[in-house]
Amino acid sequence: MTIQLHNTTRRALPEAKLKKAVRLVLSEEGGKAVSIDAIYCGGRMMRRINREFLGHDYDTDTVTFPYSEGLVVEGEFYVSLDEVGRNAVRFKSGFEQELLRVTIHSVLHLLGYDDASPEERGRMRQKEDRYLRILGAGVSSTEERSQV
């Protein structure tokens, strides 16, 4: 299993915790990682990626590119540290907890989960909360989050 973390910013990241979160989700969901690249970037880079690949001209918390289907996972995901910071303030969760949540969310996308409908978002949110608890990261109130 290859999990590579890439930080394109100057902000220090809890790399061991992030890798642990990726491994936890894969293990609990029955996934096997062939190769996962996690790229942590700033808002400008994320906006460019979001515009180029998805046609959305704004920053977002994560963009995921699965290169396989099913439980054998190969792919990459990008996480905007700027958006993580804004969400941490918005949801009163703290930066590290929000970073772990978005990382977990990204891995769930690589495993085929979607969040296009309220039901799908709710299912993903429950899984995120569960994995955050297992990691000892706590869970902020999900009331406002359910609107997103």
UniProtKB/Swiss-Prot annotation:
Subcellular locations according to the entry: Cytoplasm
MF annotations from Gene Ontology: metalloendopeptidase activity; RNA endonuclease activity; zinc ion binding
Cellular component per GO, a single term: cytoplasm
Enzyme class: hydrolase
EC number: 3.1.-.-
Cofactor(s) for this UniProt protein: Zn(2+)
Cofactor note: Binds 1 zinc ion.
Domain of life of the source: Bacteria
Name of one Pfam family that matches: YbeY
GO biological process, one term: rRNA processing
InterPro entries: MetalPrtase_cat_dom_sf_prd, YbeY, YbeY_CS
Alphabetically ordered keywords of this record: Cytoplasm, Endonuclease, Hydrolase, Metal-binding, Nuclease, Ribosome biogenesis, rRNA processing, Zinc
Main localization, broad class: cytoplasm
Binding sites annotated in the UniProt record for Zn(2+): 105, 109, 115
Record-stated family: Belongs to the endoribonuclease YbeY family.
NCBIfam families for this protein: rRNA maturation RNase YbeY
Entry function: Single strand-specific metallo-endoribonuclease involved in late-stage 70S ribosome quality control and in maturation of the 3' terminus of the 16S rRNA.
HAMAP family: Endoribonucl_YbeY
Entry protein name: Endoribonuclease YbeY
Organism (species): Chlorobium phaeovibrioides (strain DSM 265 / 1930) (Prosthecochloris vibrioformis (strain DSM 265))
